[in-house]
């Protein structure tokens, strides 16, 4: 029997031992819990999570939701090179699918915002989809989901990003605005409160959001076409919108196509024919090629295959290409193929030339295939 008074680490004061264990990232928690019952109770306890939260030791996370995962998110720890499933959220009922939501990290938490709940045909054949304004928050310290303040307007397929510690949303659609929503809102995670912003000059639907140079950019589903290169830009400093003529060369088929890294370095994937990574000259606004995403090689298959439906994320100065699917054609030439869902994760440093890709640990069960949501969280200290 272990004594309650037993030291956390024999030979070390408990406050120093707690600090040592708390500095280990979340990917090691499963191993820590196997050391002893005392360590298991420590890692799962409220004092431990509060201690990490006070010091801002969230660690770095890559959150991913894939198809056929029954709405269960998984997370990657780059320090431990480990994936692990998150607790299930109770907001999504069994037999329903969540899509069209936005996911963003702010104040060391993951927010899953809005979207549409649609039933599977077999489970609820007469039930219509429901557009929601709900917001779920995952606390990486407590490892718990919680409902927080809802948006003022239900919306799906909308623009969302974080700027200076607040979350901005705009556009999208719902049952009463099928051609686009002009309204915008901002969320303060400290006050847990949403506030209305001035409406956009024109409604936007099926749009994406980007934080760039301190402003909230709303990119429409038509970006990438020569005649549709304008975007709506909100400046939080003077609370005004402006329409900017600019060039964003990605395809809307890529849901997570733009990543902004340190020093406003912008990267995108252009998935027309082949998957090219481009970066933007911050002064001139021109785009140029950095390299390509490597093809997929399957065991016992002679040809290299192009993936689709993958996610794209930036974490700790590296770019991640996550999951996706490939079509594995039969060699008989009969035109038949299998759809292979990929758990593979590929990483590169975009400053290396040529790009040097490596594979991390593949995603854990139940993840794999097309990416529905992905976002990264990097540790930041409290003010």
UniProtKB/Swiss-Prot annotation:
Pfam families from the UniProt entry: F-box, Kelch_1
SMART domains: Kelch
Keyword vocabulary terms for this entry: Kelch repeat, Repeat
Kelch repeat intervals: 50-103, 109-165, 166-214, 216-263, 318-377
Domain F-box as annotated: residue spans: 7-54
Keyword Repeat recorded: yes
Signal peptide: none
Protein name: F-box/kelch-repeat protein At1g16250
Organism whose genome encodes this protein: Arabidopsis thaliana (Mouse-ear cress)
Native organism taxonomy: Eukaryota, Viridiplantae, Streptophyta, Embryophyta, Tracheophyta
